[in-house]
A protein has these predicted regions:
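Conserved glycine-rich cofactor-binding loop
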Residues: 11-12
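Conserved glycine-rich Rossmann-like NAD(P)H-binding loop of the short-chain dehydrogenase/reductase
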Residues: 24-38
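The beta1-alpha1 cofactor-binding region of Rossmann-like NAD(H)/NADP(H)-dependent oxidoreductases
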Residues: 50-61, 93
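Substrate-binding pocket helix/loop in short-chain dehydrogenase/reductase
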Residues: 87-88, 95-100
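Active-site helix of classical SDR
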Residues: 111, 147
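Residue(s) in the substrate-gating loop at a strand-loop-helix junction
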Residues: 131
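C-terminal helical subdomain
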Residues: 171-172, 189-227
Length: 227
């Protein structure tokens, strides 16, 4: 039976790989890059919505629109995220705010928005794509680390709250991957030994396909060369 799955940050990288891996379902990808959204939507033949997850008003409207069209959202995958690296003293306040907004506030906004319909049905799955930085802090990534530690705290707290309503929440903690997240942050870090996003997407699929009475509170995945 097809499930309705919303994936934030779905226009590239891991988000796109997840959409492709789960494409036998009703997939709706979200991103604030409309050009890439349209391209990936055509490639994967999936639905999409332009949505900036840092704008809670836009998030509410987007989620309501999806629920109105599909009747329900079975799974939310909070994947959108950005990297911020460098000495804190040389980091602008705008970049600090952006990192916290995307990595921490964004998943909180989208989770809040989907919970109403999930509460009504007393079922649903939320996967929060965090990071190994939620456990181990990298050097000169102070704000990024803080945003991911915050997400782990949110994840563990919301699990207890919503499990009483029949909703499952999984914290997903990948190591660094072969994506352009470093490049977009202005970092030329070599990601060639990182995880292939296709392998990470298969791990997400495993969580999605678990039996209804099984919950995976936390799931970590790393490339063996970087263990």
């Amino acid at each position: 039976m097809k499930k309705t799955i919303v994936i934030t940050g779905g226009s590239e990288g891991l988000g796109k790989a997840i959409a492709k891996q789960l494409n036998n379902n009703e997939i709706i990808i979200l991103s604030d890059n409309e050009e890439k959204l349209v391209k990936v939507s055509k490639e994967l033949k999936c639905d999409y919505r332009f949505c900036d997850v840092t704008d809670y008003g836009q998030v509410d409207v987007t989620i309501k629109d999806i629920v109105d069209k599909y009747g329900e959202i079975d799974i939310l995958i909070n994947n959108a995220g950005i990297l911020l690296a460098g000495d804190l003293t040389e980091t602008s306040y705008d970049r600090i705010s952006k990192c916290i907004d995307v990595n921490t506030k964004g998943p909180i906004y989208t989770t809040k928005a989907v919970l109403e319909s999930m509460y009504q049905r007393e079922e649903g799955l939320i996967i929060n794509v965090c990071s190994q930085a939620s456990f181990d802090s990298d050097d000169f990534s102070t704000v990024y680390n803080a945003s991911k530690w915050a997400m782990r705290g949110f994840n563990r707290s919301i699990q207890k709250d919503v499990s009483k309503k029949g909703i499952k929440v999984t914290g997903f903690y990948p190591g660094f991957m072969q994506t352009n997240i470093f490049k977009k942050a202005g970092n030329d870090y070599d990601t060639s030994t990182g995880l292939e996003v296709e392998k990470v997407a298969k791990a997400i699929e495993f969580i999605v396909n678990c039996e209804d009475d099984v919950i995976i509170p936390e799931f970590g995945i790393k490339d063996i060369e970087n263990y």
